[in-house]
Amino acid sequence: MLIAPAHAERNFPPNVKPAELRGVEYPYVRIDDRTYRLAPGGRIYDTFNRIVLPNAAPKTGKVLFKLDPQGNVLKLWILTPEEIARLSQ
């Protein structure tokens, strides 16, 4: 039986940049200076890559996000300090 590391490195989609999460008030997410709507089926991932409900998500922090074709937030990843450092290189 193979055992995965407890906190394996996450793979993110290409062409995404770190942004600053400034607030979550379902169904809206404030990222940098813009307010987006969370897409139907949109997912927020915490630093352990678990899906969290919008009301349980941190209100601030560094994130990566992906938009759907309508401009809604489809996926949002809360970043760890290590990921922030790695993406800043």
What role is predicted for each listed range?
Residues 32-44:
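Short, basic/aromatic beta-hairpin or loop at an interaction surface
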Residues 2-35, 50-89:
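Short, flexible, surface-exposed loop segments at domain boundaries
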